Swiss-Prot record:
Residues 30-59 are annotated as: NMP. The gene is adk. This is Adenylate kinase. InterPro entries: Adenyl_kin_sub (IPR006259), Adenylat/UMP-CMP_kin (IPR000850), Adenylat_kinase_CS (IPR033690), Adenylate_kinase_lid-dom (IPR007862), P-loop_NTPase (IPR027417). Residues 122-159 are annotated as: LID. Keywords: ATP-binding, Cytoplasm, Kinase, Nucleotide biosynthesis, Nucleotide-binding, Transferase. Monomer.
Length: 214
């Protein structure tokens, strides 16, 4: 089962990725993790990536695609894998196709921008421990205070409205065209495209996914 997850930042991809991994026993392939592992291991591609990063540049699609090819050839990907955060652009999707990587399911989590802004704006974090809360969905016992230490909670810069809206802008510009791309692939019978309402409760979305993948 080879799956690609699509959805804006804050649409709940990470939560459902964990559910899919546990349920179907397939690894999540994160390009960030792969890059770090390749650099640490000192592989040929890792060395190339490190040189680019050290020069303050973006790692090319070619290097990322090479890393993905190496990663999915490993034993734990025999039953499939879950790609999260890749592809982000049409050229990357074309690159996967040219490499002969078949995709069984493309899963989109659909959430309106305003809902995402509200979700992110409600997040509160206790920075020393990494514990996170939400003023509506997962409030602390005492408003504005960490449950364990009683220390102040803060709004991370990443969760501030202007930052969230900027990230959503990039997503719509770069990644949203993939929705159309994979819609056409599905129409041609090359993959299955599944769209879920990301505003539902987490357990409901998980149940919907399980039913669709059965």
């Amino acid at each position: 089962m080879r799956i690609i997850l699509l959805g804006a930042p804050g649409a709940g991809k990470g939560t459902q990725a964990n559910f899919i991994m546990d349920k179907y026993g397939i690894p999540q392939i994160s390009t960030g993790d792969m890059l770090r592992a390749a650099i640490k291991a000192g592989t040929e591609l890792g060395k190339q990536a490190k040189a680019v990063i050290d020069a303050g540049q973006l790692v090319s699609d070619e290097i990322i695609l090479g890393l993905i090819k190496e990663r999915i050839a490993q034993d734990d990907c025999e039953k499939g894998f879950l790609l999260d955060g890749f592809p982000r652009t049409i050229p990357q999707a074309d690159g996967l196709k040219e490499m002969g990587v078949e995709v069984d399911y493309v899963i989109e989590f659909d959430v309106a921008d305003d809902v995402i802004v509200e979700r992110m704006a409600g997040r509160r974090a206790h920075l020393p421990s990494g514990r996170t809360y939400h003023v509506v969905y997962n409030p602390p016992k005492v408003e504005g205070k960490d449950d364990v230490t009683g220390e102040d909670l803060v709004v991370r810069d990443d969760d501030k409205e202007e930052t969230v809206r900027a990230r959503l802008g990039v997503y719509h510009e770069q990644t949203a065209p993939l929705i159309d791309y994979y819609g056409k692939e599905a129409a041609a019978g090359k993959t299955k495209y599944l769209k879920f309402d990301g505003t539902k409760q987490v357990a409901e979305v998980s149940a919907d996914i399980e039913k669709a993948l059965a």
